[in-house]
Structure formats: structure tokens, C-alpha cells
């Protein structure tokens, strides 16, 4: 387990928030970039969609395929009719195509979401 991940779990214990395990399907190429432009969001190194959090929320994404941990901004949300299905199937985030390269790994880019396991951690403000 990385030092950063240990620190995140300590912050989670001290400040509250949540940690969820699930999967990360991906957007088609350039879709997330169009969403970010349409919403006029400032630049961020990582953008994802969520069925749990509003636009602008910062979360930490742990990739179990690539063993990387990065902070991502929620740049899009699930369509209201898709929220229940996304939650039921444990699709915690949807990654932009570029983000999916590090979240899922290049060898899993064409696989089903279940082949892209993630943990999403959100620490309460002040943490």
C-alpha cells in the first residue's frame, strides 16, 4: 500500500467522508474534454463523472490495475435515469478516455467496466 493511500485513510478516519469500492467504465475519446469545455470548468489534471457527487467535488481515485492514486475532479454527473443503475452495478466513476489509460491500464481499455476496479475516496472538507 502506498504512503499516499495510507495518508488518505488516516485523513478519512480523522475528518470523515467515505471510501467506496467499485468499477470505472470510460467515456469515448474527447467526450470528457467536451463536457469540461461546455461547463466552462478550469483545467484539472483528472476529470471523472459520478453518480454520487456533484460537479466540482474532489475525490481520490485508487486504480487497482495500475496501483496509482490520483486526485480527480467530478466534471460530470450521471443522467438522473441512470443513477440507480450506476449505483446498483457499482459504477462509481466514469473516466474520461485519457484518465482511463491510467485508471484501467492500456491493456484493459476495451474491457468491461468490471475489469477496471477502483476505490473512490472522498474526505470531508477541512481534511
Cite the ranges covered by each PLM segment.
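Secreted/periplasmic proteins
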Residues: 2-127
Amino acid at each position: 500500500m502506498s504512503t499516499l493511500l495510507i495518508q488518505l485513510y488516516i485523513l478519512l478516519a480523522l475528518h470523515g467522508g467515505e471510501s467506496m469500492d467499485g468499477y470505472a467504465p470510460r467515456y469515448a475519446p474527447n467526450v470528457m474534454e467536451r463536457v469540461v469545455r461546455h461547463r466552462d470548468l478550469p483545467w484539472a489534471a483528472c476529470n471523472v463523472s459520478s453518480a454520487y457527487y456533484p460537479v466540482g467535488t474532489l475525490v481520490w481515485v485508487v486504480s487497482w490495475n495500475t496501483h496509482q492514486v490520483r486526485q480527480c475532479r467530478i466534471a460530470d454527473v450521471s443522467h438522473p435515469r441512470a443513477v440507480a443503475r450506476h449505483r446498483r452495478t457499482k459504477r462509481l466513476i466514469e473516466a474520461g478516455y485519457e484518465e482511463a489509460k491510467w485508471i484501467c491500464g492500456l491493456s484493459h481499455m476495451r474491457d468491461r467496466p468490471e475489469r477496471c476496479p477502483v476505490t473512490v475516496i472522498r474526505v470531508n472538507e477541512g481534511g
